[in-house]
């Protein structure tokens, strides 16, 4: 049984009892000796060899161990140096943390334990700072993303609001247009439709005019390009002819010199001519390519010109058809407008008849008849001398005023102070059509203003001057339309009726001024 080594001392192995362990290569030690011829001397020799072998092995092991220890010592020294450098670096980096402690312990050098605690605390603080920095960066990015999302949402909200507002605006316009169309008569709607069709037809013609203009511009450019290319082609063909002539000349020379081709003493001119012919052939081929390319470009330009001319012809035919549609739309619009005008005249006549009936009911048949006569006489009559008309009116007014109190006379001013201009405009348009007044008929804002001023000034001349100005083109019929529409849309009182009639008579028939009071029963 082999004894286990407990430890080594000076390179010698010992067991756990402190005895030296001797290991033999051939058996165990025996004090009586059993080997032949050797006796005790043989055992001693074998023991010495064993001890020597063990010592040799132990030395090797020790050297190995020593080398390992040296390596470990070196590694430890390196680790220590690294630790020291690391410690110094940490100490320097964390000097803000240990400054206070160093100030209190300036008389002594901090121990490694204190530095380790400080380093640990600093590392924890650094970890916390990094954690907070990462958290802050993450929060910042999340906040930026949230802000970006908010801005995008806000922008989208504003876009939706704008779209909503635009939709509401268009809806209001559509509703207003629908309401306006609903209020129109069938004749007026027909005019609207005819106007839209005419506008569409005219727009199509304008569009085709633009297309024709563009095509003509392209055609002109193509023709100029073709003419320029034709000049280039002429030059290229001339160059090709010269190159072909040169090649033919050299080819004939080669043929002429070919009998000497095999004569070493006389073949040099032949080979020189052959070389020159090859060069001339290449030049001729290049010129032919240039001519072919130019002809190709001309053919392409001609094809473009043909295509453009066909397009111009097609658009011109479409334009002619478009012009026909415009003429047709114009005729349809004219018919629709005539139908509308006839309908409006009929309505105006009906409204005027109703107006005369109202006058009959309110002021009697005689006054209604007088109003009709004044209207008929005004047709085609130019405005007379305003001063004469004013003088005749003033004379009638003075007589009339004696029959009415100031309160009665103020009735017309009170009525005009709250006049409804929309109603007045409606009646004015009807009377203008009834009296066949052409051109624009403006409202009587200035007429009302002049009448209202009379209440304070008593001066009627500004009113007569205004009426004269309005009737300068349309004639006295315009004055009739203005004042009849005033009678139809406003309750003026009997004095106001007499005054309005007096103004008309002063312009149309001064003799009737003497009969107004009788007709009205004043």
From Swiss-Prot:
A Gene Ontology molecular function term of the record: pore-forming activity
Region ranges (Disordered): 26-52, 136-165
GO biological process: defense response to Gram-negative bacterium; killing of cells of another organism; negative regulation of ion transmembrane transporter activity
Keyword annotations of the record: Antibiotic, Antimicrobial, Bacteriocin, Cell membrane, Membrane, Plasmid, Transmembrane, Transmembrane helix
Pfam families in the cross-refs: Colicin
CC annotations in GO: plasma membrane
UniProt feature, compositional bias: Gly residues: 30-42
Topology relative to the membrane: Multi-pass membrane protein
SUPFAM superfamilies: Colicin
Main location (coarse class): membrane
InterPro entries membership: Channel_colicin_C, Channel_colicin_C_sf
UniProt keyword DNA damage present: no
Localisation per UniProt entry: Cell membrane
Transmembrane regions listed in the UniProt entry: 471-487, 494-510
More details: Plasmid PAO3 is a small colicin E1 derivative.
Free-text function comment from the UniProt entry: This colicin is a channel-forming colicin. This class of transmembrane toxins depolarize the cytoplasmic membrane, leading to dissipation of cellular energy.
Similarity comment: family membership: Belongs to the channel forming colicin family.
Protein name as annotated: Colicin-E1
Organism: Escherichia coli
């Amino acid at each position: 049984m082999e004894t286990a080594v407990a430890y080594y001392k000076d390179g010698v192995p010992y067991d756990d009892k402190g005895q030296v362990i001797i290991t033999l290569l051939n058996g165990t030690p025996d004090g009586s000796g059993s080997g032949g011829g050797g006796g005790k001397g043989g055992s001693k020799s074998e023991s010495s060899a064993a001890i020597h072998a063990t010592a040799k092995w132990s030395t090797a092991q020790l050297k190995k161990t020593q080398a390992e220890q040296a390596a470990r010592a070196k590694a430890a020294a390196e680790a220590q140096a690294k630790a020291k450098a690391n410690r110094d670096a940490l100490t320097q980096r964390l000097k803000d943390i240990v400054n206070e402690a160093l100030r209190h312990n300036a008389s002594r050098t901090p121990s490694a334990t204190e530095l380790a605690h400080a380093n640990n605390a600093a590392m924890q603080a650094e970890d916390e700072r990094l954690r907070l920095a990462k958290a802050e960066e993450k929060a910042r990015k999340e906040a930026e993303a949230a802000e970006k999302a908010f801005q995008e949402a806000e922008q989208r909200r504003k876009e939706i609001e704008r779209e909503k507002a635009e939709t509401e605006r268009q809806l209001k316009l559509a509703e207003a247009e629908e309401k306006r169309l609903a209020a129109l008569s069938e004749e007026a709607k027909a005019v609207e439709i005819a106007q839209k069709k005419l506008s569409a037809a005219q727009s199509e013609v304008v569009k085709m005019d633009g297309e024709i203009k563009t095509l003509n511009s392209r055609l002109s450019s193509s023709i100029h390009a073709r003419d320029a290319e034709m000049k280039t082609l002429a030059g290229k063909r001339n160059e090709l002819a010269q190159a072909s002539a040169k090649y033919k000349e050299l080819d004939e020379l080669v043929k002429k010199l070919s009998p000497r081709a095999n004569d070493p003493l006389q073949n040099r001119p032949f080979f020189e001519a052959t070389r020159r012919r090859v060069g001339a052939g290449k030049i001729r081929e290049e010129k032919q390519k240039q001519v072919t390319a130019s002809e190709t470009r001309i053919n392409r330009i001609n094809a473009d010109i043909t295509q453009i001319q066909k397009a111009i012809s097609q658009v011109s035919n479409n334009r002619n058809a478009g012009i026909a549609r415009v003429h047709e739309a114009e005729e349809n619009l004219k018919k629709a407008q005539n139908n509308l005008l006839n309908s409006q005249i009929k309505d105006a006549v009906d409204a005027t008849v109703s107006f005369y009936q109202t006058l009959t009911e309110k002021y009697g048949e005689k006054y209604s008849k007088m109003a009709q006569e004044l209207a008929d006489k005004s047709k085609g009559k130019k405005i007379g001398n305003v001063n004469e008309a004013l003088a005749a009116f003033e004379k009638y007014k003075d007589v009339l005023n004696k029959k009415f109190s100031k309160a009665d006379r103020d009735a017309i001013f009170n009525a005009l102070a709250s006049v409804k201009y929309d109603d007045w405009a409606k009646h004015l348009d009807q009377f203008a059509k009834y009296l066949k007044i052409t051109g624009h008929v403006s409202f009587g804002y200035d007429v009302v203003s002049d009448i209202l001023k009379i209440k304070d000034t008593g001066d009627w001349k500004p009113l007569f001057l205004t009426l004269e100005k309005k009737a300068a083109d349309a004639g006295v019929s315009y004055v009739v339309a203005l004042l009849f529409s005033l009678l139809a849309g406003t309750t003026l009182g009997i004095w106001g009726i007499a005054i309005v009639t007096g103004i008309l008579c002063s312009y149309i028939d001064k003799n009737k001024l003497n009969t107004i009071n009788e007709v009205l029963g004043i």
